[in-house]
Curated annotation (Swiss-Prot):
Annotated protein name in UniProt: 1-deoxy-D-xylulose 5-phosphate reductoisomerase
Matches recorded under SUPFAM superfamilies: 1-deoxy-D-xylulose-5-phosphate reductoisomerase, C-terminal domain, Glyceraldehyde-3-phosphate dehydrogenase-like, C-terminal domain, NAD(P)-binding Rossmann-fold domains
The species this protein was found in: Shewanella oneidensis (strain ATCC 700550 / JCM 31522 / CIP 106686 / LMG 19005 / NCIMB 14063 / MR-1)
Record-linked InterPro entries: DXP_reductoisomerase, DXP_reductoisomerase_C, DXP_reductoisomerase_N, DXPR_C, DXPR_C_sf, NAD(P)-bd_dom_sf
Pfam families: DXP_redisom_C, DXP_reductoisom, DXPR_C
Gene that this polypeptide is encoded by: dxr
Keywords: Isoprene biosynthesis, Manganese, Metal-binding, NADP, Oxidoreductase
Reaction catalysed by this enzyme: 2-C-methyl-D-erythritol 4-phosphate + NADP(+) = 1-deoxy-D-xylulose 5-phosphate + NADPH + H(+)
Amino acid sequence: MQNMVILGATGSIGASTLSVISANPTAYRVYALVANASVDKMLTLCLAHRPQVAHMVDHKAALALKAQLPAALNIQVTSGEDELIALVTAPAVDTVMAAIVGAAGLVPTLAAVKAGKRVLLANKEALVMSGELFIEATRASGATLLPVDSEHNAIFQCLPEEVQSNLGRCDLAASGISHILLTGSGGPFLTAELSNLAAMTPAQACKHPNWSMGPKISVDSATMMNKGLEFIEARWLFNTQKDQLKVVIHPQSVIHSMVQYRDGSVIAQMGNPDMRTPIAHCMSYPQRIRSGVEPLDFFKVGQLSFCEPDFNRFPCLALAIEACSQGQEATTVLNAANEIAVEAFLQGKIGFTHIGKINEDCLLSVPKQAMASIEDIIALDAQTRIYARELLAKFA
């Protein structure tokens, strides 16, 4: 039985992971649940899954949770970064689901990697920010890294074993691969009039046509920054060159991504848009377990369509692809700027189209610096956030 730590337990990925665990109770045990400040949600999860440890990033939330948990459950409640790192690196832990949204997930995820754990990577920002450092830490520790994002998981499933077992260091061309085709639905504004985008509200941006997700990733899907971050993540996971990676708009979200081979073959991974499928795949790889997802009904799907991305509609996608070509410093800046901009949009402080403008301004204006350590990455991230917050007044 695998002991699992779930980082981001109260989010959508956390909920899907717990659903898969519940469907396979003899194979997995919830060792620890980690969340930011959602006391009520965490209390409910603790009562249902009886973890050994419940960790709250927010100290006051930890105190509130401890006061409400029945003492008879004997659940240890912790808080603080040092305690979180000790938790994910504990000898009893086999697998870490890394599903904390944003830059906040980098430090604990990297700690789990350095400890040689089996890491199920749902936090794309970890690779967007730390890329080479993250991949090198995986190689040095012998950690097992498995991609949870539906697109990267789909790509992984379509690749030969010699690539799967050498993520970040593989040679796609040597394995006969010509292109990775990263699919995206285009989000809720794919066919909206360009002139109407500036007036789009957070509620509209969060209404994804196919996927059920949290607010931040939903807005990223509406701007297609999510696909841009996935482009950067794919570059590091699969060691791609720029011309080996392409974005394809696929509105139905049935094909989750594809791999094109030198001989003209294209292998695609398909399924209903439900995160329990890639989560179950990562949890059990190289075996297969029940996910609880209904099999794809091709007669109900009916039609599959594809188109090229429109960079006038999705400037954030263009910025991410450009930042990827510039290097690690640029992608770290872009990620930090985007987190500030999306947060401000969700709070009603800026308009939808201001997100891309703030991202572009930060990418052009924040001084880049060499990043040789995690401390350098965190410093550049913090510097960018300060600059991005100063920009908000310009667009308010």
